[in-house]
Amino acid sequence: MAGIAATPWGTDHAWMDLVTVPPRPATLVEALKESRRALEPPPPDPSGARDGSRLDALRRSLRSHKVTGMVVPRADAHQGEFVASNAERLAWLTGFTGSAGVAVVTPRCAALFVDGRYTLQAAEQVNTGLWDIVPLAHTSVNDWLAKTLARGDKLGYDPWLHTVSEVDRRNRVCEKAGAQCVPLPVNPIDTLWQNRPPPPLGPVIPHPDMLAGWSSADKRQRIARDLRDAGATAMVITDPASLAWLLNIRGADVPFTPLPLGFGILHGDGAVDLFMDGRKLPRPVLAQLGPDITLRAPSALADALDTLGGQRRRVLLDADACAQWVRDRLSRAGASVRLGADPIALPKARKTPAELEGARAAHVRDGAALVRFLCWLDQEGPRGTQTEMSAVATLHALRAEAQQFRGPSFETISGAGPNGAIVHYRVTPETDRRIEPDMLYLVDSGAQYRDGTTDVTRTVPIGTPTREQIRRFTQVLKGHIALATVTFPRGTTGSHLDTLARVALWADGVDFEHGTGHGVGSYLGVHEGPQRISRRPSSVALDPGMIVSNEPGYYKTGAFGIRIENLVAVAPVTEPPAGAEIPLLRFETLTLAPIDRRLIDVAALTVAERTWLDAYHARVLREIGPLVDDDTRAWLAQATAPLAPETADGTGPEATPPAVPSASS
């Protein structure tokens, strides 16, 4: 039960199937919930991080391991975006709770590396008298090490927490400095961390073939064929998302993403050895997996890798995702290690027709909840009675009314006024800001449903927006529409299209620093690769079925933030222009929610841009209107009305917000 208590909530009653047999009387259900609450591990006490006692203890431990320093990433053995509570080693050591960061500890200094999202948060949470906060935009971890390491230094690391490619790059840095990278047999933090939460025991559930569109047996045969074509006879699967997709299962071991933590070995005949705690798999799931899936304890992975080595097997590993520990074990055992891309990644990214249908249904459902929220916000925002946190709670409650809802797909970004300018802002009780007139409010949120994953951002004026806010919002909208309406040939990558989202902003000499689009899974990760839309070069083409986000923005530090985000699916152009000589692709917009007309300078839009927005809004009203109450439908009709000609001063289509139902309605 302690392992169950270490998993996120939001898995309905599936976890109860691991400890009791249905049907369950209401009294038993409540007793189980109380037992789980009592066993939930408390968050790490930050006092030991702030007073330096943990840092001192780690340095003493490193001396006993005969190393002079250590790299501590926010990572687990699976290299995922979200980690279980027992893997929050960076937070335990430093007090920093952001979703990405790396610490380096040496006898002389301690540095915490964070990206631009977390510079302010790190400075607030970490004792800067003990730790140097290093922005990754200025100095990479390896560049810092190259300047800091001395000849003869031994830099320790946990080989479970670093990928093969990371270790290769770091080894080169150490060799150049005359130092060594030393894999540690045990992570010292695991020994020092008192009351560390147990490994999570989230229930594994089947993901029906009707939602996946492809049976696990067919998937395994397809990937096994690709494996053989690549000259390998087996592959080690360390990414839980790849494992979940391949076996048509989902889990509940980490926040926000329905992942079952475990490892797999796929053999050339399509059989899989699954290394996962058997307590997580109810009997119906075991039966669904079938005879070609052999369930083994996680502790058996080492022996299984030794067996592959003893058989001199050719084993494929993804160098960018696989832990160095796996390569070390295979190499020592005599296996021939082949490094290459995960062959599951692209098939997983190319959604089946069934997955696309699920995504469309999920977005209609999500759109209804979001429209109800935006209507509520239009009523409550000007009153100044709501805060960023109360808005998050309201939106969550509206989504949770859907039977298929399984929880948020990430922690909601609820940014009022200047907080909206922090790209990945996370509200806390200490930062919670009141939503009130004369500010912009940015809300970036998403949900997990049994049939799809959503991610959407809307920016709303509370009161009357300024001319500057209208200009910037309109520029962001023009970039959004440019990407939404583009047609492109097969083989086009996201880096080819990224410029479209930025040109209107560039005209004024401004830009946004984040990527324009990320891939999204099917009841899996809200951030999924390998596809993306970004300035960073990419060799991965945007293929039919891929889902990506379209989210240009603008951020004025200390003032406001703007982002417009829809999810889109890559689809063939079914009616190409006359004389077209090559097959073309387009984007199908999935997200359904109004884009605030009060922030649009209609005079700055082209006829084509106005036509697109009017058509999009008509679709939102058509598909969402029947799903909401009469008052919300009336509000939605105004929020999606065709754009009126620009006003005399060119400030936008209307000066007043849509009518909002009264509090009594």
Please place each PLM-identified region on the residue numbering.
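Active-site neighborhoods and metal-handling regions in enzymes and metal-associated proteins
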Residues: 2-665
